């Protein structure tokens, strides 16, 4: 894994047949990515996999060696197909069972009378895992080494990220600027490539769009060096003016 301050990276593993089938649209990647960006962690890979134990184990074992942080979403609920916790235990060769602290949290949250088998299942995880507290619905996520296991429900996941801020050691904050223009990609491809060659430590992406009846392209400029972003944007604006391409917005 890359441990330098200059670059800290992460991957997300989305676990769930409902995502792969198209029944549910994932929004957690956007939430986690924006949060990581603020912490100076670059999201470099996202995988969507099914609720199959071997697939989870294989994917996590591969990514935990490759990235500083791995975030999993989904599969830690009360039903039979929620198998992420058990799979993570096997990936790390750890004992799986009732986590004492998680059990106590859930028993208190639901009350003994309503603390049924399904709810107790949410306390089952690697027994030596660190917990990620859940201010929304009680059931905690957990951490093993550099793997962070979160629920798939977007609102709950988002509420849990705040408690992780001090656990994530990021690199330099990543700054972003966007320039939108009214043109087609082919008109700016060559000069944009020349700018990218000049600013090798800046990531430049171009994304075509169609809105309000107009065709356009958004250029997203990203770097941990704010001055380089500003200089890069000046170069882009300069060639846009030379080519008389209308800017639709800059932020």
What are the functions of these language-model segments?
Residues 146-239:
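An accessory alpha-helical subdomain
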Residues 58, 65, 83-171:
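Proline/glycine-rich low-complexity loops and linkers
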Residues 30-83, 89-90:
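N-terminal small/polar loop signature for handling phosphorylated ligands or for N-terminal nucleophile
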Residues 2-46, 51, 227-230:
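Glycine-rich phosphate/diphosphate-binding loop of Rossmann-like nucleotide-binding domains
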Residues 239-251:
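Conserved short beta-strand edge segments in small beta-sheet-based binding/regulatory domains
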Residues 12-15, 20, 69-74, 147-149, ...:
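Short glycine-rich or small-residue beta-strand-to-loop segments that form or flank ligand, phosphate
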Residues 17-18, 75-78, 154-156:
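Short glycine-rich anion-binding loops that position phosphate/pyrophosphate groups of nucleotides
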């Amino acid at each position: 894994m890359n441990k330098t301050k200059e670059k800290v990276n992460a991957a997300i593993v989305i676990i769930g047949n409902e995502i792969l089938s198209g029944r549910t649209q994932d929004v957690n990647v956007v939430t986690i990515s924006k949060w990581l960006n603020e912490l100076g962690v670059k999201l470099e890979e996202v995988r969507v996999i099914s609720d199959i134990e071997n697939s989870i184990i294989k994917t996590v074992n591969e990514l935990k060696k490759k990235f500083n942080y791995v975030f999993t979403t989904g599969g830690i609920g009360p039903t039979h197909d929620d198998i992420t916790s058990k799979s993570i235990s096997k990936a790390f060769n750890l004992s799986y069972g009732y986590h004492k602290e998680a059990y106590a949290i859930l028993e208190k949250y639901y009350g003994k009378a309503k603390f049924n088998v399904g709810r107790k299942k949410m306390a089952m995880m690697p027994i030596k895992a660190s917990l990620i507290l859940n201010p929304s619905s009680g059931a905690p996520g957990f951490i093993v080494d550099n793997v962070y296991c979160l629920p798939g429900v977007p609102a709950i996941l988002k509420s849990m990220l705040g408690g992780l801020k001090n656990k994530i050691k990021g690199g330099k904050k990543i700054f972003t600027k966007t320039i939108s223009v009214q043109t087609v990609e082919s008109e700016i491809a060559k000069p944009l490539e020349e700018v990218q060659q000049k600013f090798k430590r800046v990531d430049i992406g171009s994304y075509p769009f169609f809105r309000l009846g107009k065709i356009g392209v958004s250029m997203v400029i990203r770097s941990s060096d704010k001055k380089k972003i500003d200089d890069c944007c000046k170069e882009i604006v300069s060639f846009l003016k030379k080519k008389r391409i209308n800017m639709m917005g800059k932020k």
